[in-house]
């Protein structure tokens, strides 16, 4: 059985948390996030520590307490240090260029791919084959990275495509005669 909810969330300096009933607001130097907590989960704030517990002993309540603790911990990390995901473009002529709230990608199609970045997410291109996506919401940063990767996922024969920087692509051998 997981005991994630038993670990308290320690609030770093500069992070402010407000509890209004089942609503939790987390504010930090990078921005603010809010989350609605399920009725089965109880949250207690003690100075700079948040504690999570299930209101009853039901299995689902305990699971929700652990999930809520993990989500709030991600919110606290996001508003204090932020989240980032790195993507690499591998392939001849594969390029990326960030222009404001748009990301222009050349991925071997007959047309350039233009990706509109959602509010709260920024992208920068340190080189024309690297994309760094940053934001305060971990789920949103991961979603944007997954959507960009989905345009041209890495293929197993040559390894061409858009991949996460830490991703290992399983390579296959070409068919032999």
UniProtKB/Swiss-Prot annotation:
Superkingdom of origin organism: Bacteria
Record-stated family: Belongs to the universal ribosomal protein uL6 family.
Composition bias type Basic and acidic residues, residue spans: 154-171
GO annotation, cellular component aspect: cytosolic large ribosomal subunit
Function, in words: This protein binds to the 23S rRNA, and is important in its secondary structure. It is located near the subunit interface in the base of the L7/L12 stalk, and near the tRNA binding site of the peptidyltransferase center.
Name assigned to this protein: Large ribosomal subunit protein uL6
Organism of derivation: Marinobacter nauticus (strain ATCC 700491 / DSM 11845 / VT8)
The protein's assembly and partners: Part of the 50S ribosomal subunit.
Pfam families from the UniProt entry: Ribosomal_L6 (PF00347)
InterPro entries associated with the record: Ribosomal_uL6-like, Ribosomal_uL6-like_a/b-dom_sf, Ribosomal_uL6_a/b-dom, Ribosomal_uL6_bac-type, Ribosomal_uL6_CS
GO molecular function: rRNA binding; structural constituent of ribosome
Record region (Disordered): 154-177
UniProtKB keywords: Ribonucleoprotein, Ribosomal protein, RNA-binding, rRNA-binding
GO biological process, one term: cytoplasmic translation
């Amino acid at each position: 059985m997981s005991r994630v909810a038993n670990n308290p969330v320690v609030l770093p300096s500069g992070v402010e948390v407000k509890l209004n009933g089942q609503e939790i607001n987390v504010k930090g130097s990078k921005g603010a996030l809010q989350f609605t907590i399920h009725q089965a989960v109880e949250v207690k704030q003690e100075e700079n520590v948040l504690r999570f517990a299930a209101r009853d002993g039901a299995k689902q309540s305990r699971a929700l307490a652990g999930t809520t603790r993990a989500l709030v911990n991600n919110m606290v990390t996001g508003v204090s240090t932020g989240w980032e995901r790195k993507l690499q473009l591998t392939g001849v002529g594969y390029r990326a260029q960030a222009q404001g709230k748009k990301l222009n990608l050349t991925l071997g199609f007959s047309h350039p791919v233009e990706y509109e970045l959602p509010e709260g997410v920024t992208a920068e291109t340190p080189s024309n084959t690297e994309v760094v996506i940053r934001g305060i919401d971990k789920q949103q940063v991961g979603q944007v990275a997954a959507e960009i990767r989905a345009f041209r996922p890495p293929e197993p024969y040559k390894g061409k495509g858009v991949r996460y920087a830490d991703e290992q692509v399983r390579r296959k051998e070409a068919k032999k005669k």
